[in-house]
Curated annotation (Swiss-Prot):
This is Argininosuccinate lyase. Residues 1-22 are annotated as: Disordered. Its main location: cytoplasm. The gene is argH. It holds the Pfam family Lyase_1. PANTHER family: ARGININOSUCCINATE LYASE (PTHR43814:SF1). GO terms for cellular component: cytosol. Keywords: Amino-acid biosynthesis, Arginine biosynthesis, Cytoplasm, Lyase.
Length: 476
């Protein structure tokens, strides 16, 4: 969502000694300046201005349709709300901390524009269901944006996977060489992870798509409202079934943050790999100048700052998830002012997730694999030892545990000789097991190794290309 305001733009921070005109009927005096400062949320919840006005226009239309408010008044209200939105999007709207939040700032400005009819807008509505509606709409938009960002990154990874379906690289366990894999297979691992991330956002979106509007403060309303009408107008599947739950619920934000945290964790893992791979010690990839920076003192440096910043920003997303769970864990039903603290961390997490997705997509599209370095690394570290053990099982009918032991002895022999397994002479192998034939050398090359891994989901180029085609079909 486009940010419709910021904490340092068009905000009047002047205090007031008068009671708030929106709720001050039972108060003899206005809040202390410190109370006003701690109570105000307009510095951040102005980001929900579009959703607030969208919800108010839907509510107003329903008030007219049900005969609760005259249609002539509602027409003026709905047009006035568009004027307010135009001012906000044009940057001329003056926010006031004395009015606390986006809801009262919008209503106050609407009153200035159209007069008395504005006072009818809040009929059959509370700020409790209003803010829940606004926040749900905002989070829903962010879920859609996250899915789009994930799919863009997946497409970039598919391009790398397709180009490198045959490129051999080391696969790692414990960051030690394990078995040869293909570059394309490694890229497709992240496509799969991100696919689960997108599905989590979709699942959460489906679950949260119930409208709280009409729950009022907590108990519903005595006015003959049509909650189905407002739910449909706002793109919800249905109205929420329990008014207490509707205003108390922030599960939708928690599910967004949970899905964002898991997605962010995947991005951080890949960022860590890119930092390592782009180092002089690995030289697996070259990151583009567009996503790197230099040093103010060391002229030779090309630093993977985008990857490092992705890795760091992920902590803010994790922190937001924990922060909101901590806010919510001790709250009795229904609404407490604590819940005002649900937004800033969610806004920040959404911003950082979208930034991380975009930066990762750019890095992936631009990065160049160093194919000779990848293959050289894949060919070292006895990476085809498992292929040798499998060959002993197939060709000599050896139990796998015995094959494992024989292979381990051959690895030790090669290590003592300072060579890799393919460099051992057949006579060397006979010193460990006399039945080994020269056919063993067919499986010790890394290209033969990856080509043999044809099981579904395996690393063979054939499997990689099939998985790329499957995902291109999924993404459309």
């Amino acid at each position: 969502m486009t940010d419709t305001g910021s904490s340092d733009t068009n905000t009047d921070t002047t205090g007031t000694s008068k009671a708030n005109t929106m709720w001050g009927g039972r108060f003899a005096a206005g809040p202390d300046a410190i109370m006003e400062a701690i109570n105000a949320s307009i510095s951040f919840d102005q980001r929900m201005a579009r959703q607030d006005i969208e919800g108010s226009r839907a509510h107003a239309a329903m008030l007219a349709a049900t005969g609760i408010v005259e249609s002539s008044d509602v027409d003026v209200i709905r047009e006035g709300l568009l004027t307010v939105l135009s001012e906000i999007e044009g940057g001329t709207f003056q926010y006031s901390t004395a009015l606390e939040d986006i809801h009262m700032n919008v209503e106050a400005r609407l009153t200035e524009i159209i007069g008395t009819p504005a006072g009818r807008l809040h009929t059959a509505r509370s700020r409790n269901d209003q803010v829940a509606t606004d926040f749900k709409l905002w989070v829903r938009d962010q879920m859609d944006a996250a899915i789009s960002g994930i799919e863009a990154l997946q497409r970039a990874l598919l391009g790398q996977a397709e180009a490198g379906a045959d490129w051999v690289m080391p696969g790692f366990t414990h960051l030690q060489t394990a078995q040869p894999v293909t570059w394309g297979h490694h890229m497709m691992a992240y496509v799969e992870m991100l696919g689960r991330d997108a599905s989590r956002f979709r699942d959460a979106r489906t679950r949260m798509n119930e409208s709280p509007l009409g729950a009022a403060a907590l108990a519903g309303t005595s006015f003959p409202i049509d909650r189905d009408m407002t739910a449909e107008a706002l793109g919800f599947d249905r109205p929420s079934a329990n008014s207490l739950d509707a205003v108390a619920d922030r599960d939708f934000a928690l599910e967004f943050l949970s899905a964002a945290s898991i997605c962010a964790m995947h991005l951080s893992r890949f960022a860590e790999e890119l930092v390592i791979w782009s180092s002089a010690q690995f030289r697996f990839v070259a990151l583009s100048d567009r996503f790197s920076t230099g040093s103010s003192i060391m002229p030779q440096k090309k630093n993977p700052d985008a990857a490092e910043l992705i890795r760091a920003k992920i902590g803010r997303i994790f922190g937001a998830n924990v922060a909101l769970m901590t806010v919510m864990k001790g709250l009795p039903l229904t609404y407490s002012k604590d819940m005002q603290e649900d937004k800033e961390q969610t806004f920040d997490a959404a911003d950082n997730l979208m930034l991380a997705l975009a930066a990762m997509e750019g890095m992936v599209r631009d990065m160049q694999a160093n194919v000779p370095s990848l293959e050289a690394a894949a060919s070292s570290g006895f990476s085809t030892a498992t292929d040798l053990a499998d060959w002993l099982v197939r060709e000599l009918n050896m139990p796998f545990r015995e094959a494992h032991h024989v292979t381990g002895s051959l690895v030790k022999l090669a290590e003592d000789k300072g060579c890799d397994l393919p460099d051992l002479a057949l006579s060397d192998m006979h010193s460990v097991h006399g039945d080994i034939t020269d056919g063993v050398f067919d499986v010790l090359g890394v290209h033969n190794s990856v080509a043999s891994r044809t099981s579904y989901g395996g690393t063979s180029p054939v499997q990689v290309r099939e998985q790329v085609a499957r995902w291109r079909d999924i993404l459309g």
